[in-house]
From Swiss-Prot:
The gene is cbiW. Its cofactor is [2Fe-2S] cluster. Keywords: 2Fe-2S, Electron transport, Iron, Iron-sulfur, Metal-binding, Transport. The keyword Lipid biosynthesis does not apply. GO terms for molecular function: 2 iron, 2 sulfur cluster binding; metal ion binding. InterPro entries: Thioredoxin-like_sf. This is Putative 2Fe-2S ferredoxin. Transmembrane segments: none annotated. [2Fe-2S] cluster binds at residues 23, 54, 58. The keyword Iron applies. Binds 1 [2Fe-2S] cluster. Belongs to the 2Fe2S Shethna-type ferredoxin family. It comes from the Bacteria. The lineage of its organism: Bacteria, Bacillati, Bacillota, Bacilli, Bacillales. Ferredoxins are iron-sulfur proteins that transfer electrons in a wide variety of metabolic reactions.
Length: 127
């Protein structure tokens, strides 16, 4: 069995692409391939690493998260996936209209005018 261990020195972005069951039913595989193909097309392979995972935002499926900026994207279609690579990864500009969360040094916050659901609190109350 072969095990892959990537050397990520020099990597500028890590994109976590949701491939959980909800995301897969809503185009997660297509979004994954669109991101990876556009990264290759723009010769960004050395700067961008992608990982398939479940991001826990099923209502916003499919979801992609870009680090180090901490931007969470919702409903990533092939078109949005291409824009994430072209405008965010290559161009440095977030797609504000597609954000669920962005990072502001205090933590993740929902952008103004977000239509995404708030979700379930991760911290259990003592009540």
């Amino acid at each position: 069995m072969s095990v892959t261990t990537w050397n990520l020195n020099g990597t500028k972005h890590h994109v976590l692409i949701c491939n959980g069951s909800s995301c897969m039913r809503k185009g997660g595989e297509e979004a994954t391939q669109a991101i990876r193909n556009k990264v290759a097309e723009l010769n960004l392979d050395e700067a961008v690493h992608t990982t398939r995972t479940c991001n826990g935002r099923c209502k916003d499926a499919p979801v992609a998260i870009v680090y180090p900026s901490g931007d969470w994207y919702k409903q990533v279609t092939e078109k949005v996936a291409h824009r994430i690579v072209e405008e965010h990864l290559a161009g440095g500009c977030s797609l504000k209209e597609s954000l669920i969360y962005e990072y502001d040094q205090k933590g993740f916050v929902s952008p103004e005018n977000s239509d995404s659901i708030e979700g379930i609190d991760k911290v259990k109350s003592n009540a």
